[in-house]
Amino acid sequence: MAETCKMKYTVFHSPLGKIELCGCERGLHGIRFLSGKTPSSDPKEAPASPELLGGPEDLPESLVQCTTWLEAYFQEPAATEGLPLPALHHPVFQQDSFTRQVLWKLLKVVKFGEMVSYQQLAALAGNPKAARAVGGAMRNNPVPILIPCHRVICSNGSIGNYSGGGQAVKEWLLAHEGIPTRQPACKDLGLTGTRLKPSGGSTSSKLSG
């Protein structure tokens, strides 16, 4: 748990401003936007370069992997599909809860170039009536971008809120992935079957615990 972990921190410079990463030897704990930088309307900015607080030898593997993943994401998001994800060791991943189940399902199922509604994600997590609880899980996501809560939208097609950095950041991330932010209603997007991959399959990420 967080209180017993020896935490390490690093700051990553991105087109969205500074992003703080924190983790321990057992896994990544958090990704946090530090600055309220208004993202450019054009996501094709200069590649991000990480700024490390402390030498690379001081960083646990989880932070090294997360830095590598984010650097690839901001340069070419599709390239992240072949990269390993860090182990996750935030307390939310150490207990059996609906929030953990929702976040894990989102990470495994909703891939690059895809979106899902809150209600659809609730169904994927085993409770189709829990759309509001899914919204709470998105607000409590400790590792935004890595677990792509920006790909979860409202059933009416609006993109909804984004606690990771505000609606402008959510729009930027979707545009960066080549997803139009002005969409028809979610039920018309063909998200089940055609836009979403089957819930089976494997992922290279792992929960540490």
Curated annotation (Swiss-Prot):
Required cofactor names: Zn(2+)
Cellular localisation: Nucleus
Domain of life of the native organism: Eukaryota
Major subcellular site: nucleus
Cellular compartments per GO CC: nucleoplasm
Alphabetical list of Gene3D superfamilies matching this protein: Methylated DNA-protein cysteine methyltransferase domain (3.30.160.70), Winged helix-like DNA-binding domain superfamily/Winged helix DNA-binding domain (1.10.10.10)
Cofactor binding description: Binds 1 zinc ion.
Binding residue positions for Zn(2+): C5, C24, H29, H89
Biological processes per GO annotation: DNA repair; methylation
Catalytic residue positions: C149 (nucleophile)
Keyword terms, alphabetized: DNA damage, DNA repair, DNA-binding, Metal-binding, Methyltransferase, Nucleus, Phosphoprotein, Transferase, Zinc
Reaction(s) catalysed by this chain's protein: a 6-O-methyl-2'-deoxyguanosine in DNA + L-cysteinyl-[protein] = S-methyl-L-cysteinyl-[protein] + a 2'-deoxyguanosine in DNA; a 4-O-methyl-thymidine in DNA + L-cysteinyl-[protein] = a thymidine in DNA + S-methyl-L-cysteinyl-[protein]
Modified residues (Phosphoserine): S14, S205
EC number: 2.1.1.63
Residues bound to DNA: T99, Y118, Q119, N127, R132, S155
Top EC class, one word: transferase
Region (Disordered): 35-57
Keyword Transport: no
CDD domains: ATase (cd06445)
A GO molecular-function descriptor: DNA binding
Note: This enzyme catalyzes only one turnover and therefore is not strictly catalytic. According to one definition, an enzyme is a biocatalyst that acts repeatedly and over many reaction cycles.
NCBIfam families: ogt
Family the entry assigns: Belongs to the MGMT family.
PANTHER family found in the cross-reference section: METHYLATED-DNA--PROTEIN-CYSTEINE METHYLTRANSFERASE (PTHR46460:SF1)
Record's function text: Involved in the cellular defense against the biological effects of O6-methylguanine (O6-MeG) and O4-methylthymine (O4-MeT) in DNA. Repairs the methylated nucleobase in DNA by stoichiometrically transferring the methyl group to a cysteine residue in the enzyme. This is a suicide reaction: the enzyme is irreversibly inactivated.
Name of the protein in its database record: Methylated-DNA--protein-cysteine methyltransferase
Origin species: Cricetulus griseus
Source species taxonomy: Eukaryota, Metazoa, Chordata, Craniata, Vertebrata
